[in-house]
From Swiss-Prot:
Disulfide bonds: none
Protein's name in the database: Phosphoglucosamine mutase
Catalytic activity: alpha-D-glucosamine 1-phosphate = D-glucosamine 6-phosphate
Gene behind the chain: glmM
Cellular component GO terms, alphabetical: cytosol
C-alpha cells in the first residue's frame, strides 16, 4: 500500500506531487470515510492558506467532496486552528485545511480533522489510503439531489476571531509587533490584537501567493526582531504560514522559543491551579534548560516523540491541558484541540499584562543551553539499530559520563529520511561541539553511507 499521509497530512510540491487529481481523490475518499456513518447530510469545512496553488487544490478537493454528497462550507483563507475550532463548535462532520505550514510556497498539503476537531487517527488515514490504492473507485456516485452543495462561509473567519478575543485580556498600553508570514494569520491577527486594544505594527501582511514564509514568519524572525527594536514594542509575535505555531521576540529583540513560551504559560496556569495534573507535555527535543526550570518550579513533565500529533495524543490520553514543541507548536487544550499560534500569542500577552512583567523577565527563568544537531546519512536498515552497534553505544555512554548530569545527548533516527540525528546540549558551545562531533565521527565510521 502506498503511504500518502505523513505526520501532518499529505504534502508535496503542488501540481507535481500534490496534484489536482490527488486532491480530488482525497476529497472524495476522505469525505466518504469521515462521513459514512452520518444519518444526515454531512457538513465539511474547507480552508486554505495564501499559497498560489491553494485555490487550484481547493477547487479539486471540493469537487471530490461534492461528488459523495457532502455539504461543503468554503472558509477561504483561515488559520489551521480556525478550521479545528469551527468543526467542533459548528458540529461539522469534518474539516480540511490546505496548507504546507512553514514550508516554502511551491509546496502544499492537505490535512483532515475529524468531527471532534482533532487530526485523523491512524486507522482513518489507512482507510483513506486503501481507497486511494484500490484498482477502481467503487464508491457511490449520487446524482441530482444526492450531490453535495457548496456554501461560501466568510463568517467563519469572524467567528474564529471573536473566539480568540474572548480568551484574552485588555492589552491597552501594550505595543505588539506582528509578523503574519504572508500567510493565513494575515487575515486575522491585526483585527484580533486591535480588538484587544493593543497598539500594533505589522509585517508579512501582504501575501501574493508566492511570498508565504519567504524571509518572514516563525522560521525567519530576523525582520521582526528589527521591528521590535525600531518601534519599542513590548513583544513581537511571529506566526508560520498556517498560524499553528508561534515564536516570540522580547522587548530587547531576543528570540523566545516554544520551550520558553510553554514555561511562561505553564507557570502562570500552575500558580492559579489551572495546569491539569500540574504537568506540561513536551518532546524529546525540548531544551535541558526548560526541564531544569520546570523542576525548579515543581512542574511535572511528560515527554513524547517529536511531532505535535504525539504531544496531542499524550495530552488526550492522560488529561493534560498544556503541551507543545520547541518549534512553537503550543496546544492549550482548554481552548482548542491543535496548535494555535494566535491563541498562544494572546495567552502570552495576557501573562505579561496580568503579572506586570516584561517578556525578557518572564523568559529569564529558563536558561537555554547551547544545542547542536548533526544529521548523518546512514543506510535505512541501520538507522533504527544504531544503538545496537557497540562502538556507538559505548561512545554515547562515555560522553554522558563526562557530562555528569550537566548536559544531554539524544541520538534518534529521522522519521522520513535515511538519517541519524545526533543532538547534544551543554553549558558552552565548545562543549556541545565536542560531544556532538565525537559521537558523529564514530557513527560515520561505523554505519555512515560515505564509508
Amino acid at each position: 500500500m502506498g503511504k500518502y499521509f505523513g505526520t501532518d497530512g499529505v504534502r508535496g510540491e503542488a501540481n507535481v506531487e500534490l496534484t489536482p487529481e490527488l486532491a480530488f481523490q482525497l476529497g472524495r475518499f476522505g469525505g466518504y470515510v469521515l462521513s459514512q456513518h452520518e444519518t444526515e447530510r454531512p457538513k465539511v469545512f474547507v480552508a486554505r492558506d495564501t499559497r498560489i496553488s491553494g485555490e487550484m487544490l481547493e477547487s479539486a478537493l471540493i469537487a471530490g467532496l461534492l461528488s459523495v454528497g457532502i455539504e461543503v462550507y468554503k472558509l477561504g483563507v483561515l488559520a489551521t486552528p480556525g478550521v479545528s475550532y469551527l468543526v467542533r463548535t459548528e458540529k461539522a462532520s469534518a474539516g480540511v485545511m490546505i496548507s504546507a505550514s512553514h514550508n516554502p510556497a511551491l509546496d502544499n498539503g492537505i490535512k483532515f480533522f475529524g468531527n471532534d476537531g482533532f487530526k485523523l487517527a491512524d486507522d482513518q488515514e489507512l482507510e483513506i489510503e486503501a481507497l486511494l490504492d484500490a484498482p477502481e473507485d467503487t464508491l457511490p456516485r449520487p446524482s441530482a439531489e444526492g450531490l453535495g452543495t457548496l456554501v461560501d462561509y466568510p463568517e467563519g473567519l469572524r467567528k474564529y476571531e471573536k473566539f480568540l478575543v474572548t480568551t484574552g485580556t485588555d492589552l491597552s498600553g501594550m505595543t505588539v509587533a506582528l509578523d503574519t508570514a504572508n500567510g493565513a494569520a494575515s487575515v486575522s491577527a491585526r483585527d484580533v490584537f486591535l480588538d484587544l486594544n493593543a497598539e500594533i505594527a505589522v509585517i508579512g501582511e501582504k501575501p501574493n501567493g508566492l511570498n508565504i514564509n519567504d524571509g518572514v514568519g516563525s522560521t525567519h524572525p530576523e525582520q521582526l526582531q528589527e521591528l521590535v527594536k525600531e518601534t519599542g514594542a513590548d513583544l513581537g509575535l511571529a506566526f508560520d504560514g498556517d498560524s499553528d505555531r508561534l515564536i516570540a521576540v522580547d522587548e530587547t529583540g531576543e528570540i523566545v522559543d516554544g520551550d520558553r513560551i510553554m514555561f511562561i504559560i505553564g507557570k502562570y496556569l500552575s500558580e492559579k491551579g489551572l495546569l491539569a495534573h500540574n504537568t506540561i507535555v513536551t518532546t524529546v527535543m525540548s531544551n535541558l534548560g526548560f526541564h531544569k526550570a520546570l523542576d525548579k518550579q515543581g512542574i511535572n513533565k511528560a515527554i513524547t516523540a517529536v511531532g505535535d500529533r504525539y504531544v496531542v495524543e499524550e495530552m488526550r490520553s492522560s488529561g493534560y491541558n498544556l503541551g507543545g514543541e520547541q518549534s512553537g507548536h503550543v496546544i492549550i487544550m482548554d481552548y482548542n484541540t491543535t496548535g494555535d499560534g494566535q491563541l498562544t500569542a494572546i495567552q502570552l500577552a495576557k501573562v505579561m499584562k496580568e503579572t506586570g512583567k516584561s517578556l525578557s523577565e518572564l523568559a529569564a527563568e529558563v536558561t537555554i543551553y547551547p544545542q547542536k544537531l548533526v544529521n548523518i546519512r546512514v543506510e535505512n536498515s541501520m538507522k533504527e539499530r544504531a544503538m545496537e552497534v557497540p562502538a556507538i553505544a559505548n561512545i554515547i555512554a562515555k560522553m554522558e559520563d563526562e557530562m555528569a548530569g550537566n548536559g544531554r545527548i539524544l541520538v534518534r533516527p529521522s522519521g522520513t529520511e535515511p538519517l541519524l540525528r545526533v543532538m547534544a546540549e551543554a553549558p558552552t558551545d565548545a562543549e556541545v561541539d565536542y560531544y556532538v562531533d565525537t559521537i558523529a565521527d564514530v557513527v560515520r565510521t561505523e554505519i555512515g553511507c560515505d564509508n
